[in-house]
Amino acid sequence: MAEELGMVLTSELNRPSVMEALPSNFNRARFIQNTVALVQSNEDLSRMPQAKLVPALMKGAYLGLDFFNGECYAIPYGQQVQFMPSYKGMVKLAKNFSKRPLTDIYAHVVRDGDEFETGMDGGQEYVRFKPKTFSDAPIIGAFAVAQYVDGGIKVETMSKAQLDAAKRVSKAQSGTAWKFFPEEMYRKVVIRRLCKGIDLNMETVEQARIMQDDDAIEAEVTEVDNPFGD
């Protein structure tokens, strides 16, 4: 299975039309090695027909995302394999393709008792956050920030109610990630919403087509070895 999959991916990646659609810094050998390793470690993926599996894997190649490093997921769903960038992958795409160059993207949860304020000052967004040290108070919301090279920022905020609404529509709402790492999952939700609001200048038509696929972007992970991509 591994050798056959590697050969199929190599053949696909060497097609002239595909080569033109890949990112300029794409590492074919590393992508094939990491992707084959991922499929070998996942029984559900290894059982999928290659006709269903390979198209999902190729979406990661077109975007320059690494499945094995948790930048994107190939998710068995019925008789299909669904592709989805992780929040780590969304951050990478935003940094690589933002029309307005970025220096950093980060997110925090806000707990009861933390000092938090966001607004506009002189036409520029701002955020002020002072968390209580070692606080285990209830989470009341989350925010994410994109910092631009020109000094500006973009802020996304979500209340606890909005975060929980996102959880309810997630296919993973009963999974271990939400149960044991809710803070990380809240950060994931708000970062993904932030990244979707950043204007991207994709290199190829194929990349733009994948990013415009609402199902690919909005779908939630079921059960993946590392749900946070870290």
Language-model segments: residues:
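Glycine- and charge-rich intrinsically disordered segments
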Residues: M1-M19, M202-D230
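Binding-interface segments
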Residues: A2-N201
